[in-house]
Amino acid sequence: TIHGRALVRSGLLVTAVCTDCHGDHNIQKHSHPDSTIGRNHVVETCGKCHAGVAAVFRESIHGRKLAEGSALAPVCTTCHSAHRIARTDAQGYQLHIVRECGDCHGEYLATYRDTYHGKITSLGYTKVARCSDCHSRRK
């Protein structure tokens, strides 16, 4: 995981370990309603270390849909699988994020692919506008 690599490769002294996310007692499958990594609690779990990101998420369209009880609303792990997380400054991440958005927003991905930005992205160039550059709370 990115957390394990942070500890081993980057030499960080403090990083998340298994029990930080999964707990150390009463561990449940992610599909269980009481699971710390299930959709009912994962924003809170991730927010223990990523408070700023969790706050931004709660104010986003996805966070608001989750608060309204939408079963279709994505949560942290919908786009950021805890065991496949990549650094946002990694080479392939910028290309990967377009595909992640397209998993749920396929009709918009098809339109994006027809634009200048989409064509450049398909060639592997990463310094180009992506979904979140225009469709983000940070605008």
State each model region's role.
Residues T1-K139:
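Short sequence/structural segments immediately N-terminal
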